[in-house]
Structure formats: structure tokens, C-alpha cells
């Protein structure tokens, strides 16, 4: 009855009146009558069935259609019953009356419409006319055209001489009238006003058309100039012969009244009128009235520090100065930016106070300069030596004099923005090195996110676990604690071995300045108890030491191997299906031949005549290895007809027709060419892995296939969730490749396992000792866990004695060299059995024959983003039901098998999600949002994601981009953001690299970014750890690990990229060569975008500033109690023991990443000055008010000095009240 009432209410209306109540009663009476009829004829009295019959009768008003609908739904009613029901329903259920109200019917809002109202910033209109990057051919054509124009253009020197001659003739003949001068001035003013109005009208347009606007403005200005003016030949000439310089020339040479006030950025002649200890006053010439300005002591000379102003200038001396800023009649000047002989501007990009700067001034700058920030103007480039130097302190009388001058309005406070009213300290005059600066987070939200950030909304972390209190979640937490215990036990063993060294020898190790022989003996003694070889005993036994041979062995030829694959029998049907459909979903088991054969079949069918065949892979290693295999089968060299492209490595040529690439590289190609015009077919392989890039490609390619009817899209998956892919891609047909499957027996545990690692090893030993022949596959979460399991299992098997059959233990994880990974494909020798202990890479990416037994603990390690803390973490979580089925299927490929699930059946049913959470819903999306914005996609809510990411993650990503300067106050991409999108790096690294161009250290930053992109630069052999540490310490820099990496690369470069040098210094030569390749790629990108690559020499402060500009979110301050505390969330972190700063413990640092092992460790740490945080991230940090308690100080606990007569907390006010 309740269902009937609810349905009646939904059908009739939401606001019940007398008529509505009567209609509800009529509907209930009808339901009751239909139930009676059904009970009389069929013996069924079901209200739900009665309501269903009523709904069918309302949709089908005639007898024939009503009968047909009933038969279609499986009803076996007689004609008499059908006619009675239809007559009864039509009689008792009157038709709905049309609405008499004049108000329009309000439809209920969909979920997406509600989200659009809540988050308007996420649904801004897209910008289809987004600028795309030019390829190398376009750049070459443009350069050739500019060279031709340059050849036709008269020289600049000739134009200057011609102007000077005309000016001299005009001056001598005195034929120019004042009325004509006034008219020309008026025309120029009108022209400027028109330009300003034009800018105001176009200010709200899309930022992607900024380059076109600038070009049109400059063209219009050139058309309005004299007939003798030639068009500019390039962007530099545009600035050189721009309107601003033309006005300056007229100001100097045309006879007209001088201006009343100076212009910011212009250069004037002047005379020194007075000298102070902090600078000198200069009277400007060429103005109508007397105008004086201050040249600060730091603005006098570029070369070195000035101790005494009188050493540089004298009273009455004539100088050339540049106007930096002025407030009222008080002006700030600079001499160091002007050549005192020629008057040339040595630093034209510098601005000091932009408040008075007109929009026309800024419009003349190069729009592609990457120094534009929507939040903060880029910090000025100071003189060559940027290190902070202690200057002479200002005397008390001088301080008093400055205060009196400010109080008398002779000097303005605005000229000294950092002036401290209490102490009278001027900026950069007497900075205190040991000043304790308090930095706080800016509480203000970005304008376009007001009310939506974590400051005003409760942002919860993404839930990737179905039941956080279930047995699987508890087992995952228990395993983390057990792993920590095992690490600590190993550490204690090592320390015990160290303590066993005789004290007489150990003193040479403790002594900071020992003799060489004693140090060597101590180093050797420290190796006691260590493994004498790099390879542990279990690993030597597994891989056969140095005598092992790697590679999958087979007697079949390449053609026979191809014909043995399951997909070969379906070759013709597959090619025909691709021909008949624009989008095709291909489902096939791992090892069926999808990845290697489909591209070749389509190439043989002639699809390469229309373009390339592109195939994406979720992993770099897969793209490289598959391309190598296909090139062998195709009969060509790798890089010719078949090639691959991964980040920082392009192994293709103009002849390439089959191209394998990572999904991220195809996404970058979409950034350049949204329609992918050079491809005829795109194949998204391993789509079931649902990486971030794959999910974004789904939405982009959906649009592309609608624009390009000639393009084919193939989506392949190894799992059985094909229906979801088909529904997403316009109900695309599904092509299934039948695999070799056998029945698999599923076995569950009766009780939950607390230590799944130990349970896995016990299960493996039971299988080995009791079950028939057949190899075993065990799924664990990561490298550390797998190595531990292999070591424990080897020791346990060894303890059973020689009579037990041999068990070959083989680990598999991504960090293992590929040649060692191939050992798992070799069959076990007769009388023995192999056990493969692998990560989830063996679920779908690897096909291992001979597996009959699968041990599944039910866990996987996933990267999860916490939007509250803004940190990505690797977390051990329960797998999904789809993953559990996939793992069990591994046991049924060779023959009937068994799957041992180390969890209960109830846990499988109640604690596991149906499918795993896509990566796009659990990771940081800053890079993804930046790429989408660069493609002109601003409406993120309407973007067709297969599974939409959480709103909290999108908002956090936009907030991060805003603080980096990539988004403006409206949430749209800035020029800096567009530049950042063109680098294949994380946004923070992009910002760091681009800012280094402005700071003049881009050559060093290129090297640092390249070294950060590779892993394991140093290595420590266990038998030579002391020597390796000693060699590494030679490269340590006091500034931090980033500059240590720079020192390593530069030393390698100075030693002519020598491999023996790397071996001698315990440095991975392969990692350095990889960094060198990455550096070349990044250098090419910077050259393509005309970004200067300059060196800072010994001025490493520039490098530190550049690092701070990108990684300011990762700032941490030393905590008085222990370690460091991050500024964002006050999390306790520690400097990693391998860091160059481990023994220095500086006050302020920024780190590259956090690593969770026994503690939260900071990796790649660099010291910073806290002032830089405010300088480079004013939208994120601010200097706390010294008159108020900051949040950090409020959290600190006051600990009194020891008093033997009182309790420690007796001094507190709360205790004093209690005593009363």
C-alpha cells in the first residue's frame, strides 16, 4: 500500500490538496480492484503486479497494443481477462487533466545541473579556438619568410641617420609651425586613447587569442606612422621600433614643451644634489618643473657592493638615471640599469612599482614571455651576485633623520614598502641574518573558488575501501605494522653487528680526521656480517648468479608463434569488423595476441595508406618491449616502419606506420593536434587499467571520431566489463577473442587472516608438499614485500632439508630488470616446481604458462590522493571483485587449476568493490586539469568522463594551479599556464623551469629537472657502503640535494661523460645517460619556444629561488621538538639520511617528495630563505603579524624551567584558580 501511495503522489503532484487526496483514493481503489481481478482469474494477489499492469494500460490504450505489451513481458492472460482489465482501468482511471496554472512546469533538476549551480567555475564555456603549438616544419617556414623580409628591410642604422638628417634640416630652416606640433600631439593622444578603448573592449575575451590581439595592435600602430617607417621584421624589431621608442625619440628631438612629470621606465639626464648614507638625490632635467628623486645605495652600481655612496658619485656630478616609480613628487631612481656613457637601458624588463604603469606600457611587452604571472609580477633580476650580504648598519641619528623626513612628508613610506615603523630598518640595508620570520598561509580563497575550497567546505579523502572496519582493512593495517617491525629488526641486527666491532678499530671510523689506513680497516670491519655480494643468497639461487641465461626459449619460428596465437583464427573476421564499424571493443584474455597482432593485421589490410596506426600502452616498458617484438615480426629495424614514443624518448622516423606509445604521449599529441590528423586508426590497449590519461583520451577521442568519420577507434580490454565500454562508446559492437580457459576451483579461508604474508608462504609450502605438479603464482603488493617473502620462503625450504623437492622462487615487479623478469617464462626442471611471487603486473600484463595454483591474499598497493593534505600516498587496499576473478583466471590457462583466496567468502561479497576505483578518482589532477585547460576545455563538468572525478579533487587541482600562477582570478589559463602545459612535466617542475629563465639560471635548472626525472643516481654495494658514502659526500653541497645532483652531472660532464668515472664514484652510468637524453629533449622544447638558456655561474641563490618558486607548497620549518613541520598541514617530517643536509638541519627547507618508510622522509631537500615564500607565492603565504600570535605559536606548548619545589604545570593560570 505504501508503494501505491508513493506512486500516486508522484503521478498526481507533490502538494496534496483536496482534489489530489481524492485522486489518491481513486488510484488505491483501482489497484485494489485489479488485484481482485488477478486473484479471481490467476490466484495472484500482488500490488506491484497490479501497478505494473496499470502502467502498461496507460501506455497502450487499445486492446491489441495492450495484449502485445503483456505478452512481451511474459504474461499468460486470457483475452477476456485482458479486456476486463483494460475496461476497468480506463473507467476508474480518468485521464490526467491539463494544468490550469499559467506558471511553466518546473522540471526537476538533474544531478549535473545541481553541480553546475554549486560549482560555476567548473562549467565555464569551452574555448574551441585555442592556440596550438607549431611543429618544427612550421617554425622553419616562418624563419625563412622572416629572413626574406629582413633582406628587403632597410637597416636600423640607416633609418636613424635619415631621421637625424631630417631633424637637423628642420631645425635649421625653422619651417615647422607650433600649430602643426599641437595637431600632431593631439593626433598621437587620440591614437593612444583609441588603443586604450580597444584594449578595454577586448579585455574580457579569451586569453588564447592574446597573441593575435597584440599582433593586430602593433600592425595598426605601424600603419599610423610616417611613410618612411618600414614594417618590423620580427618580435624584437617590433619592440625596438615600437610606438614607445618612437615617442621617446620625438620627446628628445622634436621641439615641443617638456612634460610636467617623469614617465616610469624612461631614462633622464640629472645632477646629483645631495649625498646621504643610504643613497643620493638627483635632480631630473628635461621637465617643466624642478623634480628630484632618490637613488638608493643598492641602485648605484651593478658591479659589486657599494660601501660608501661618496665612492661612486659626488655632489654636482651629471648622471643618467632610470625612473623606477614615483608617488606624488617623490621618485625612486636607478643608475645601475643605465649605461652612464651612452644612456642605454641595460635592464628594459625591470619594473619597480606597477601601480602607475599604464596598460599601454605592458601591452608592448612580448606576450609570449613566460614571466607573466596573474598573481604576482616576476621578481626582478638583481645584479650578478645575489647572495645576501650584510651591509653597514644605519646609525641612530640617521634613523631619526629618516623618520623625521617621512613624518614631514619629505620622504614617502611608499618608497620603502618594507619599512619597519618600530625599528626604522630600511629594506636591504641592515637585514638581520638570524631574524626569526613567521610565515602563515593566506586564508583568502581564490576569487573563482570562493566558498568551495577546503577552507569553507568539508573535503573528505576519496574512499577506495568499501568497508573500512572489515577484516580485509584490518589485515592491511596489521601488515603495515608487521612490515615496520621486520625493518626495525633488521636495523637492530645491523647495529648489533656494528657494536661487535672492537673499539680500537671503531675509533678510526668515529674519528673525523683519521689516517687513510685506519679508515680503510674500519670500513672493512663495518662490512662484517654483511653480504659479501650484491645479490642475496635466495636471489642468486633463483637467477643462477652470473651463469644464468635469460630470455623466453622456444623452438618455433616467428611465423609459427604468430599462427599459434588464439587471435590468428579470427584475423579475417576482425579486419571485417574494423571495416564495418568506426568504433570497436575487443575483449580477449592476456596472451591472446591483441597488442602485437591487431596492428599488423590492419597494416596488412592497407589502413596505413591513410595514416599511421597508433597503439597506446599504460606503461613505458610495455610500449618499448611490444614495439621491439612487433618490429621483429614485421621484419624491420626498430624505429623504421615500427617505432615507439615515450616521455623524453622518440624512436620513430618518417617511415613509421605502426607507432606504440604511452597514453600520456598521445594526450600530448592531442594538445598539439586535437583531431589527430596523422592517424588513421587509434588503438587504446589495456583500457581496463583505467589510468588517468586513458580516461581523458576516452572523452577526447569520442569527440574526435564524431569530427573525423574516416578515423577508426579500437578499445581493447582483458577483463569482462566490455558492456560498460560499449555503452560509453555509442553502443559500439563487442568483438570477443575466445581464450584457452579451464575450470578453476575457488577455495576460501574459514576465518580472516591477520598476517596475509605469512599465510601466503604457508599455503605455498602446503601446495608444494601435497598437491600434484604445477607451478604456483602468488600475488603480493610491492617490491619490499616480495623480497621479504622470497627470503623467508627460501630459508624455510632450506631448513626442510635436501629430501624435499626443489622449489624455484622467482620474484616479479616492475623495478626488476627485464632480462631477469623473462626467467619466469622458463618451465621448471623435472622433479621441481616454480613459484612466481608477483605484483598485480601478473594479473593482465604478463602471461605465464604452466600455472595451476594461484594464491590470492586479496590486496594491492594503490596511489591515493588525499585532497585534505594534498599528498599522494601508496596505500595497501583490498582488491575488487573483478580483480579477484582476473587473478583466479590465471590458474585456468594451461589446465584445471585451483585458486586459494586467503579471505572469507563473506569478505569477498561484502568488503570488496565490484570494480576497482579508476585512477582519475583517486589521484591528483593538477596536471590533467592544466592539459584540459590548454586544449580549451574549461567546462570540466560537461566533459564526457566515463567515471567523473570527485568535485573536491578538481577544486583542489584548480587551487594548486592558481597558487602556481597558471590560472587567473577567473579560473582561466594565463600565459604562464600555457607555457607550463607545453612541458611534459609536473606543474611544479614546469613553474620551476620557466621561472629559472627569468632568474637567469635556466641552464642549471635544466640539469636539475633532468636528474630529478631519473631514479637511483647513486648506489651502495653492501660490501662497500663506507667507501660509497665517502665518495658521495664529495658531491654534497651546503645548499641541498638539488645542487648536489647538479654537481654530480657537471662533474660527469667535466670528465667527458666517462663510464669508469661513474664506476669509481659509485654512480649509475645508465641513470646519467638517461638524464642526458632528457636534458636534450627539454633543451629542444626551450629552443622551440624561444626561452633563453643562461647560466648563473656561482650565484646558486638564483637556483634556490627558482626551486622555491615551484615547490613552495612543499616548504617545511624546523620543529623545536623533533624533525620538521610542513607549513601546509603541520605534519611532522624528517630529512632522509641519504640527504646532503641530514647532518646540517637548516631552519627552512623545501622538498621534492615525501616517502613513507619507517618515518615520513623528505627526499631531495634544499635550503631556502623564508622571505622567498612570500616573494614567489603571495597568494599562498604571508608574513604573520608580529603583534598577534600565529597558528604555529598557538600550537606550541610552553615548557618551564625545572623547579624542584613546584610541579611542572603549577605556574599555569588554571592551576592557580584551582588552588583558590
Swiss-Prot record:
Q: Where in the cell is it found?
A: Nucleus
What tissues contain this protein? Answer: Expressed in skin, cervix and nerve. Also expressed in the brain.
Map motif DEAH box onto the chain.
685-688
Q: Which UniProt key words apply to this protein?
A: ATP-binding, Helicase, Hydrolase, Isopeptide bond, mRNA processing, mRNA splicing, Nucleotide-binding, Nucleus, Phosphoprotein, Spliceosome, Ubl conjugation
Q: Where is the composition biased (Basic residues)?
A: 170-179, 197-210
User: Cross-link Glycyl lysine isopeptide (Lys-Gly) (interchain with G-Cter in SUMO2), residue numbers?
Assistant: 140, 399
Which molecular function term from Gene Ontology is one that the record holds?
Answer: ATP-dependent activity, acting on RNA
Q: Which residues form the Helicase ATP-binding domain?
A: 575-738
Q: What is its EC number?
A: 3.6.4.13
Substrates-to-products reaction catalysed: ATP + H2O = ADP + phosphate + H(+)
Q: Where is this chain compositionally biased, Basic and acidic residues type?
A: 160-169, 180-196, 232-259, 362-371
The residue ranges of the Helicase C-terminal domain are 756-936
| Regions annotated as coiled coil | none
> Which of this chain's residues are annotated to bind ATP?
588-595
Gene Ontology terms: cellular component: catalytic step 2 spliceosome; cytosol; nuclear body; nucleoplasm; nucleus; spliceosomal complex; U2-type catalytic step 2 spliceosome
Main localization of the protein described in the UniProt heading: nucleus
Q: What is the effect of changing residue 717 to L?
A: In LAT; inhibition of pre-mRNA splicing and nuclear export of unspliced RNA
Q: Which family does it belong to?
A: Belongs to the DEAD box helicase family. DEAH subfamily. DDX8/PRP22 sub-subfamily.
Copy the domain comment.
The RS domain confers a nuclear localization signal, and appears to facilitate the interaction with the spliceosome.
The name on file for this protein is: ATP-dependent RNA helicase DHX8
Q: Which organism is it from?
A: Homo sapiens (Human)
